[in-house]
Amino acid sequence: MPAVTYEHIKTCKQSGARLGIVHTPHGSFETPMFMPVGTKATVKTMSPEELRQIEAKIILGNTYHLWLQPGNDIIKHAGGLHKFMNWDGPILTDSGGFQVFSLSNLRKITEEGVEFRHHTNGSKLFLSPEKSMQIQNDLGSDIMMAFDECPPMPAEYDYVKKSIERTTRWAKRCLDAHQRPEDQALFGIIQGGEHEDLREQSAKDLVELDFPGYAIGGLSVGEPKPVMYKMVEHTEQFMPKDKPRYLMGVGSPDALIECSIRGMDMFDCVLPTRIARNGTCMTSQGRLVIKNAKFADDLRPLDENCDCYTCQNYSRAYIRHLIKAEETFGIRLTTIHNLHFLLKLMEDIRQAIREDRLLDFKEEFFEQYGLNVENPKNF
């Protein structure tokens, strides 16, 4: 039996969205679910206790960054990532591939792997499917990701075709190199750019390899949202119904709703934590940029409909002061709020699926959030 399994609870009669439970060695979580990103073994400014309080059920770690610092050997010595960071819930680690392709301009792709330069000190590094598996086995995450090639968007058709074929070959090598399948589930990553036939080919090739779960990669990288939705909708039909489906890099409220409707179960993104550090807050009325002068004497909470720690205790004026003064506590407060907002949104999505009314919920949410249902602007 694989380390991670998917239990289907129901399908929304109105939208076709899925309600399910993903079972892992470190606990189970309901889907659709948003996963906060803890790049360097921490969700920036948040303690594990605070993550539990806002009902985060699963978090991400980043293989590339943890390999470079502090090193997978140190984390293995500590008993794995869960013990190292004192998080007893599920953890998903990415393969390191996205960072290699996005952070390093000086890279050389061969069949063996990718040679590239360290993103800060310029030293020469090499990452292969086997090396990615070794690092992730050392980290001990519940869900590991296969090492894939991430073609830029847009890219020439022939380049993307060769890229997905290499991704499939690398996926086979990942399966062969994976040392702990009884403890850790390895997910395959479907690529294909914005080409429907290549997405289909990539999905079918990877499904033949029988991974315990599948991700859609290479989207949410700057393409218009209608293109992303079209690719998700097309690819979903070739993904197994009895396994988790993970859409990588998606975290805006509108996209979480739209892609839940299109059958996705798991999402991650640095968006809520990254914009929090700039003082941008997600609210039920849309985005709020707390640095704006009009909030200097505004004693209301960030969102009057929110019951998070930040909104129950602090005013816009105070949070604006902290952010303007570059006080760390301000970033903590906006981070707590943004993550709570998205996790509560996912809870609302799951409830709407239970009640067979996700399309109605989408319309209500978009109207309040200031989005046009027919043509949502990029949020």
From Swiss-Prot:
Its cofactor is Zn(2+). Substrate binds at D94, S95, G96, G97, F98, D148, Q191, G218. Keywords: Glycosyltransferase, Metal-binding, Queuosine biosynthesis, Transferase, tRNA processing, Zinc. Zn(2+) binds at C306, C308, C311, H337. One of its GO terms (cellular component) is cytosol. Homodimer. Within each dimer, one monomer is responsible for RNA recognition and catalysis, while the other monomer binds to the replacement base PreQ1. This is Queuine tRNA-ribosyltransferase.
